[in-house]
Amino acid sequence: ATMAVRNVLVTGCSSGIGLALAVRLARDELKRFRVFATMRNLEKSEALKEQAGPALDKMLEIKDLDVTSEDSIRRCVNSIPQRRVDVLVNNAGFGLIGPVESQSMASIQHLFDTNFFGLVRLIQEIFPDMKRRKTGHIVVMSSVLGLQGLLFNDIYSASKFAVEGFCESLALQALKFGIRISLIEPGPVLSEFERKLYEEAASLDLSGVDKETLDIFHNFYLAYSKEVFTALGQSPEEVAEVG
């Protein structure tokens, strides 16, 4: 018997790992995956369309999904035949670097709203269906910073520690229902994610930050981390292989 095609919902597909993974699954030679590639802003879907090539509209469908909105998540899941999500890939997220006293509470809460609460909202919507069907796979893009902290990544690292604790706890329940939960913990990845990170760091208001901290941030952290990204950075495609 032929294996049933699995419905895969991927979040954060406008660039980086989400885009690479959606394309890789959609172009699977055995056509085992129907991919619902989602993003918050459909105007950013050009790169995905281009790379999906012939798989577009056959094995890959692009949908609008904002992980910070329950309504948006529900609409997206309701638009999938029988609401059947066999594999959920939670990938939407962004980083934040800099001295913690220079971050606004609004930007800190926005990061958690996406990186952590976004995952929680998706689970609330999709997990009960998976439990009913007694099958499913949840793949969560975490980070090596969900395992250990890093200078000037306090808030981002905290959001990933939250993701890790949530998933480790949920996995214990999921096992009883035949559902797998996988945490992927990449190190540095060279992508749009990293480019945006440095761009935003450059525009931080650092006027209230002491000289010593600024010195560590600019002359040590930024200089060093750029080198690390360049020397050790993986491509999004390499990370997609793991999935």
Q: What are these language model-derived features?
A:
Residues 14-16, 22:
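N-terminal Rossmann NAD(P)H-binding glycine-rich loop of SDR-like oxidoreductase domains
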Residues 27-47:
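Conserved glycine-rich Rossmann-like NAD(P)H-binding loop of the short-chain dehydrogenase/reductase
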Residues 68-83:
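Conserved Rossmann-fold cofactor-binding substructure of NAD(P)-dependent oxidoreductases
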Residues 99-100, 107-109:
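Substrate-binding pocket helix/loop in short-chain dehydrogenase/reductase
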Residues 123, 159-162:
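Active-site helix of classical SDR
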Residues 143:
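Residue(s) in the substrate-gating loop at a strand-loop-helix junction
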Residues 177-229:
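C-terminal beta-strand-loop-alpha-helix "lid" module of Rossmann-like NAD(P)-dependent dehydrogenases
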